[in-house]
Amino acid sequence: MTNTLAGPDRSRDISQPLEKLGPDEAMKVRSDYLRGTINEGLLDAITGAVSGDDNAKLMKFHGVYVQDDRDLRDERRRQKLEPAYSFLIRLRLPGGVATAAQWLKLDELARAYGNSSLRVTTRQTFQFHWVLKNDLKATIQGLHEVLIDTIAACGDVVRGVMASVNPSLSSLHAEVYDDARRVSEHAMPNMRAYHEIWYGEERVATSEPEEPFLGKQYLPRKFKIGLVIPPYNDIDVYTQDLGFIAIAENGRLIGYNIVIGGGMGRTDQAPETYPRLGDVIGFIPKEQILAATDAVVGTQRDFGDRTVRAHARFKYTIDTHGLDFIQGEIERRLGYALEPARPFEFVSNGDAYGWAKGENGRYHYTLFIENGRIVNREDVALLDGLRAIAAVHQGSFRMTPNQNVVIADIPAKQKPKIAALLREYGLDHRNEQSLLRLNSMACVALPTCGLAMAESERYLPTLVTKIETILAEKGLEKEPITIRMTGCPNGCARPYVAEIALTGRAPGKYNLYFGGGFHGQRLNKMYLENVGEDAILQAVDAIAGHYAQDKNPGEHFGDFTIRAGYVKEVRAGREFND
């Protein structure tokens, strides 16, 4: 493709002097490649946080967030105490794969430092919550013992790379997982600072550039990559900054269709921000995946907005400069024009629960984990049960993009043992849920997330129970409907592609959306703004009743809400706020 434009507007990107860019750009430059004064801040005994003006932001590049218990915030303020600080630690786990030995170490660290809780994320990794400052190094060094790190799990870098589950179901899945791992290793920052701060390694003087690809300013914002194998769009490939859709012939991987420009984040009352689904721009042979990654990430590095962070994601770079220009720039860096995209089809973006047998004769069990929270509760000992399984398991574990866990690669001879442990701990009944609940997803939100305006993980199960009653009354209990909730509009649970979605506005108040595509192919549209539970249930009740009466055979709920006129179809991200 030839670039026919006179030239791009470079007034907001990395070509400009530092003083013309946003404050985070200067912060990154002065951080000495993300070292800052984190070490000194960790030693400051006066506060439970990390002192130093830049360190809270810099620690995100290390996979660590400063948080506080918002349930206690007002009371501690009244007592003139600082917030009850703790830390979130997010792991880098390409493709969501962990060995049994790694699982046992995660369990040990969760019990020692993470409030006996493991949280599976919407990007196939784990988070520890409630880690105290004095336990940060012990936790990260414990992860290092089993070859896991937290590098680039947050920050203005390529985040954790996703891949369809289950890699071991076929040789195709294995190839795609291997590519996801290679992309992750290739695209991550070098980050010698991480090794010095968390592992105590000495700084080594060198004349070589410390970050030859990313440079001192890294990327304008986070950058998300995922690899998917049709027909299951479990990673929601259209929501990724860069997506690779695997194309196979005769069961063998030949290459990938490239998708660019997806992203969920937006801000209420800021119509210039919006979710966007990625565009399929062409096909590459499988051998070109690392070169394509460099070309796309490099384009965003050089042309992304570094003046206004709310406008810095790749989706806005594309809409600012135009898809034709961005594709032309990618092709210029590759040195060739992309081939036309190959045909593919998606049928859902959910998980298939229960037992499955791979072509190699090994078994896999997908276990429903409501909102990804692995803890022991009165009704089920999830943490204990999965630890018992990991202690004998001869295969691996896979975290799914829908926050569930696959006990994978089980030899046929070991299947009865794993099945017996599932029964012993009551895990064999976890999948016996409504299709609505099995297709539900929530972010963490309160009490730990500093951005949350309303409940999400703690509230969605209750709301789902009430909607289940409505659906059962109308004979819709066997209809698979996706429902997602977030505590703010940033979209961590990818709500804007769900058939029913709620994003928090204030305590007990949400925006209600309908019309997302069942396999993640279409954005939804706001139906009600800033409403409480009664209004939400009334709306669902009315539309579900109409759906039960007038739906076409095989018509999904999201499709019906558009056909029946409840919401308009959103054909492009810029239409989302219209």
UniProtKB/Swiss-Prot annotation:
Q: Where does [4Fe-4S] cluster bind?
A: 443, 449, 488, 492
Name the coenzymes or cofactors required: siroheme; [4Fe-4S] cluster
Name-wise, this protein is Sulfite reductase [NADPH] hemoprotein beta-component
Gene3D superfamilies cross-referenced by the UniProt entry: Sulfite Reductase Hemoprotein, domain 1
UniProt lists the gene as: cysI
Where does the record place the region Disordered? 1-21
GO CC terms for this protein? sulfite reductase complex (NADPH)
Self-association or partners: how does it assemble?
Alpha(8)-beta(8). The alpha component is a flavoprotein, the beta component is a hemoprotein.
Keywords, ordered alphabetically: 4Fe-4S, Amino-acid biosynthesis, Cysteine biosynthesis, Heme, Iron, Iron-sulfur, Metal-binding, NADP, Oxidoreductase
